[in-house]
A protein has these predicted regions:
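Mixed-charge, Lys/Arg-enriched low-complexity segments
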Residues: 1-9, 55-93
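Functionally constrained cores in energy, signaling, and assembly domains
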Residues: 17, 40, 44, 87
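Short, conserved beta-strand/beta-arch hydrophobic-aromatic motifs that form part
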Residues: 32-55
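Negatively charged, low-complexity tracts enriched in Asp/Glu with abundant Ser/Thr
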Residues: 1-34
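Intrinsically disordered, low-complexity regions
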Residues: 18, 28, 37, 47, ...
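Broad hydrophobic/π-residue packing in well-ordered secondary structure
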Residues: 19, 23, 49-57, 91-92
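Short linear sequence motifs
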Residues: 21, 44, 48-49, 75, ...
Length: 93
């Protein structure tokens, strides 16, 4: 069985490079396909196609919210565009 969300992530054309994803602990972890470094973590919110977007904080050494005032929740397509264009997700690649 192939996960439709993983397929959508892996088919996304990211200008920074190809992504691959794996399902873990109620969410998805996205990696840079070239380096294998983690890029982002997405947790599904509710029953809809909306995700809480997290980045790896080198300071906190854990996944952290991207928004200045809390969580950033976006539909999958908007989330992928957001990840592709924000530098905070690419510090470890």
């Amino acid at each position: 069985m192939t996960d439709a969300i993983i397929q959508q992530i892996e088919q996304f054309h990211c200008p920074r490079g190809r992504l691959f994803a794996e399902r873990r602990n109620r969410g998805y972890t996205l990696y840079d396909a070239q380096s294998g470094a983690p890029v982002e973590r997405m947790r599904q919110v509710g029953q809809q196609d909306r995700f809480d977007i997290l980045y790896w904080s080198l300071w906190k050494e854990r996944w952290a919210s991207t928004g200045p005032f809390g969580r950033t929740i976006l539909p999958i397509n908007d989330a992928l565009q957001f990840i592709a264009h924000e530098d905070i997700f690419w510090v470890m690649t």
